[in-house]
Every structure is written in C-alpha cells, then in structure tokens.
Amino acid sequence: MKKLIYLFLTVLIVACSGEDGGNDQDNNDGDNNGDNNDTTCEYVLNTLTVTNATTDSATFNGIISLEGNCEFPIIEQGFVYSTELQPTIADSKINVNGNDVTTTIENLEPNTTYYTRTFLTNDLGDFYGNEVSFTTNETICDVVYLDENGITIKAYECAEVGETGVVNGVTYTVVDEAMLREMIADEEDVTKIATTKVTDMSAMFANSPFNQDISSWDVSNVTDMWAMFTSTNFNQDISSWDVSNVTDMTIMFKSSPFNQPIGNWDVSNVTSMQAMFWRNTSFNQPIGNWDVSNVTYMAGMFEGTVGCNIIEKSKFSQDISSWDVSNVTDMRNMFSNGKFNQPIGNWDVSNVTDMSWMFKNNHNFNRPIGDWDVSNVTDMDYMFEVAKSFNQPIGNWDVGNVTNMHSMFSFATSFNQPIGNWDVSNVTDMGDMFRQGTCCCGYPGLEVYYDFIGTFNQDISSWNVSSVTICDDFSFNTPAWTLPQPNFTNCTP
C-alpha cells in the first residue's frame, strides 16, 4: 500500500511541474513501464511547442530534468512522435540531451498530423510528458523547372499531366505519351511541353514533315527511340538530350535529313543501332566518342540509299576507330552505298556472324582489316561487291565458318590479294563470287550502267570446294585471271 502511495505522489508531482505546453494541456500523462520508488525525485517532462513546421520537417521544443534527490538517473531522453495519439518509444524517437531540449525532425510526410511527447527512461521504466500535435504543410508543386544545362525543361514528380508551369516567362504543359502522340497527330506546337513522364518515343514522328525545335525536351526517362524520326524533315539541334536510358535506336534517323552534332550523347545503354542512319544521305557528324559497348546490332547503320547515284550515298566518314564493337553480332550492310573510309582495323569483330553486304557499293573504303577475327562469321555474300577501291591483304582471315560467299568480290575492280590459303570447306554458295563485266544500278527505269574490269589474278586452286553447290558465273568475264582456279565438282561455274 505504501508503494502505491509513493507512485501516486511521484506522478502527481511530474504532472504539475511543467508549463503550459501547446495543444495538449496534460503536461504528463503519468505513463510508465515500471514502479517509481524514487520518492524524493521530481520528474520534469514538459513538451512545450512545435515550431517551423514545413512539408517534411518540424522543430520540437521541451524541458526534461530530474529535480531533488534522485536515486535513478536518466538512461535516455528526448522526443517520441507518431501519426497516432500517445506516441511511445516503440514509435519514432530521437534522443536529445540537456534540460532545455530542442531538435529538428526531418523526412516527415506532407499534409500530415503528428503527435509528439517528451520522454525519459531510467531503471524504473519509461516516462512521458504532455502531448502536442502539429500538421506539416501541404506540398506546393511548381510543376516545371529548368535543368542545370540551361536548355532542358523538366517536370517535378508531383506535377500532373495537363498542368502548366512557367519558366523564364514561357508556359510549358506537362504531357504523357498519350497526350503527346495526340498533339503530334493534330500537328500542334510541341515546343513548349515537359516530356519527363514519357518513356516511349518509338515512331513518334515517323513519316511526317515534322521539323520543330524540341531541344528543350526531357528524354531522360525514355527507353525506346525506334523509328523516332524515320522519313521526316527533322533537322534540329538535340545535342543536349539525355539519352542515357535509351536501349533501342533502330532506324531512328532513317531517310531523314538530320545532320546535327550528337557526339556527346551517352549511348552506353543502347543495344540496337540497326539502320540508325539508313538512307540518311546528310549525316556526317563526329560520333567517335560514343560508348557502343552494349550494342549488338549495327546492320545497315550507315547504309546509303539503294542505287549508285553519288547524291544518294551516305556521306558518313568519321573516325570511329575507338569504338568497342566487341558485342556486335550483325554488321551486314553497315557501310554499303556510302563513302566511309576510316581506319577500323583494330576493331574486335570476333562476335560478328553476319558481314554480308558490309561494304557493298562503297567506292571509297580501302583500309587495312587483315587482322580482323572473322572466325564466327557465317555470311559474307556481297561483302565487297562494287567496292571499287578495296585492295587490302585479308589472306590470313579464318573463314572456316562461312557458308555463303555469293558475289563477295563481284565488280570489285581493285581487289587482287592472295587468299589461296582460305579454308572454304563449309561454303555452299560461290555464285558470281568474282564476276566482272557490265552492271547497272539505280531504280527501275533510271538505271546507270558501268563496265567493271577486274584485276584479280591469284592461285586459289587449293581451295576445298567440295561443299559448294552454287558456283554459276563464279569468274564470269575476268580476262585478267590466268592463274589456276578451284576445281568444282558439284556445280558448273
């Protein structure tokens, strides 16, 4: 009975010791998890005020002390807080030393009511002061802002689709993919929009006359740019675009006049650049610093238009010797119908399986590529057809896995290198392989005819052509070739 009286007196002393402390006038509710036998000690627990409340933070103020002859010292003290009434140390807590205690709590939720109390813990248990409530401010969304690059307009995460915001006196509208595609279909002005919420821009402007200034677009969340500007009139500066999350750039600028500096783009996540500049007869910008280490498809990347008209050829001929192409598997048509003539002999092409048409109708290329590891290539048909300048030693190539060499050197008038040691035992098609003579190119009805007189004259009689079943016109119209040729047994050359 005496013990219960002591506890009652202690709680009464604590409850009466504080000052008026805010919304909750009960300075101490007397909660404790133990018996208070510290009868000559006064526990002062006063939650005073909560100040400086923002959307995610607030400052707590209070008094915590022991007065008198206190047998049990404080082990820890501070504030507890929660979105529920009567918070305890089982909720959120923060320790604060001293008598006049003040601390700022962060990472709170906006527009939310919280409850806080002072607390102390000693060997007798946990004790709490009066409760004070407060509400954090509601989030005010500014909608859009100017990126640190000074060009890109970005939308805040809190911004809603359709909302507008002003940057430097210009009003921008937040859009998502559906809204953006509808605007484009209606031929609206899309120069004053925030595209932060758009992740897919595939075929966004395909087959349209689009040519608006969209340099301020935020494409940092876009992953797909497949066919984005295919067959458009687009030729605007988009060098500031953050394309670091894009994985697909297939036929992105196909058949467009685009020729802008994009050499600083981060393309490290792109896996496909297939036909990226196909039939783009304008692009010729330095992109040698691109990180293409994740690209697997480069087929037709710089391929010009079909035909031989010099005006329609791809103009691209920039130094890309430092590209890491070790993951590329497909290089067919990569430089066909173009003017490319840069050193790429140090490329690691060991994973490439298809080099068909790679330099077809490229009249300029003549760089050493004899050290290439082509051991995984299976298709070399038309690889150097009408590559009129190429004449580099490639006799050490391991072509043991190649099955198709159709028209590989047809109309390649300069090529005359020893390749008699090649292992062609798996090749089945050698039709037109060294064919020379008259050839036409261009569009039906607009053909241009050329006479090709080759110089190839090497002994390749040791070739194992036992697997070849197609060899028609193998060496058609090659008057310069006087040295022994292969002995075909399964077809007639």
Predicted regions mapped to residue ranges:
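Phosphate/oxyanion-binding loops and surfaces in catalytic or ligand/nucleic-acid-binding neighborhoods
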Residues: E19, S82, N477-T478
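Residue-level signal for mature regions of secreted extracellular proteins and peptides
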Residues: L9-T10, G34, T55, I63, ...
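N-terminal processing/targeting junctions
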Residues: T10-A15, Y114, C308, Y449-Y450
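Short, surface-exposed linear motifs at loops/turns and structural transition points
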Residues: G22, D38-E138
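Terminal export signals
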Residues: Y6, C16-S17, T102-T104, T196
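Bacterial Sec-dependent N-terminal signal peptides
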Residues: Y6, T10-V44, N137-C141
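Positively charged n-region of N-terminal signal peptides that target proteins for export
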Residues: M1-L4
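Negatively charged
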Residues: E138-P493
